[in-house]
């Protein structure tokens, strides 16, 4: 009797697990193998062209994927433009005057449409472009799971609430990532995306003038192009990784150990807290960092995708069909 009850419970749990993972389970690395076999080459060509013109664009495309996935899943909602009757996510605090690369995705979408019209989603193009950006800048490669569809809606409040700001505490970072099904280790690994790219003065001003857990010479260097007065030089840029700002490597973590994290939300990863040991691991074992980063990217790409008959395949990424 006990064993049969146990069997029923096991089967029930199995069914629950099947339903819980059904969306991401419908994603596959060969989703377009028959319907659009040239999708990878087409996207890569577009990314290479954009990054060759401006290496920072690689970081911007990677960040675009993160900002998309953290708001109702990886559904290209971040690309939807505001209209007189529709408010998208682009004016949210984490995105306004900040997200970049939308025009690059639009251009790539046009190229993909010319090869196989109405087949590949904008959401999948963002995912592939993020991977290609990492590879082009010297980072790891991985097989991108595909089959996402594009949303017909967006969430301004979701963008404002779900994406952690640069002032985040460690506990806030952990909770924001946990809310998306990502572990603390995933969070530390994915924060390594800050090995490339730049940040605006307004996002690190408080750190370089008010915080004590910062290398003094580093702070002075940053202060030279980021005045203390709010409203002055707000959009002046500084590299997130002072050492190798356009190369994907583990210097981001080395900087943290030397108290040279640019953002408050960077340095909290190495400030006497629970994530210090992971930062040290990534400093001493770059291969562990890259493998964890890849695992985190795949996991992030699995966040509540629209699949099957859900959503749509947009003809133009900035608007619903």
From Swiss-Prot:
Disulfide bonds join 36-116, 69-74, 122-317, 201-226. Its main location: secreted. One of its GO terms (cellular component) is extracellular region. It catalyses: 2 a phenolic donor + H2O2 = 2 a phenolic radical donor + 2 H2O. The modification Pyrrolidone carboxylic acid is found at residue 26. Its EC number is 1.11.1.7. Removal of H(2)O(2), oxidation of toxic reductants, biosynthesis and degradation of lignin, suberization, auxin catabolism, response to environmental stresses such as wounding, pathogen attack and oxidative stress. These functions might be dependent on each isozyme/isoform in each plant tissue. This is Peroxidase 4. It comes from Vitis vinifera. The lineage of its organism: Eukaryota, Viridiplantae, Streptophyta, Embryophyta, Tracheophyta.
């Amino acid at each position: 009797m006990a064993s049969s009850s146990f069997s029923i419970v096991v089967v029930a749990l199995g069914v629950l697990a099947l339903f819980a993972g059904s969306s991401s389970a419908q994603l596959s690395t060969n989703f377009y193998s028959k319907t659009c076999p040239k999708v990878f080459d087409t996207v890569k060509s577009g990314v290479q062209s954009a990054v060759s013109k401006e290496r920072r664009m690689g970081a911007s495309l990677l960040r675009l994927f993160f900002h998309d996935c953290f708001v109702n899943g990886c559904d290209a909602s971040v690309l939807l433009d505001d209209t007189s009757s529709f408010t998208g996510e682009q004016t949210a605090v984490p995105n306004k005057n900040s997200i970049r690369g939308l025009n690059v995705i639009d251009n790539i979408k046009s190229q993909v449409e010319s090869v196989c019209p109405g087949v590949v989603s904008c959401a999948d193009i963002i995912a592939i472009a993020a991977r290609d950006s990492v590879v082009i800048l010297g980072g790891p490669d991985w097989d991108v799971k595909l089959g996402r569809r594009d949303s017909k809606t967006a969430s301004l409040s979701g963008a404002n609430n779900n994406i952690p700001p640069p002032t985040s505490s460690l506990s806030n970072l952990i909770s924001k990532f946990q809310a998306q099904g990502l572990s603390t280790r995933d969070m530390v690994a994915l924060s390594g995306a800050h090995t490339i790219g730049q940040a605006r003065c307004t996002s690190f001003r408080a750190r370089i003038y008010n915080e004590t857990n910062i290398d003094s010479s580093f702070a002075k260097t940053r202060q030279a192009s980021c005045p203390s007065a709010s409203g002055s030089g707000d959009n002046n840029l500084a590299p997130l990784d002072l050492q190798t700002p356009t190369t994907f490597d583990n210097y981001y973590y080395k900087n943290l150990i030397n108290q040279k994290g640019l953002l408050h939300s960077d340095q909290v990863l190495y400030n006497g807290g629970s994530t210090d040991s992971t930062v040290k691991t990534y400093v001493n074992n770059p291969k562990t960092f890259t493998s964890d980063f890849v695992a985190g990217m795949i996991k992030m790409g699995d966040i509540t995708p629209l699949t099957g008959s859900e959503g749509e395949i947009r003809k133009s990424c900035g608007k619903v069909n």
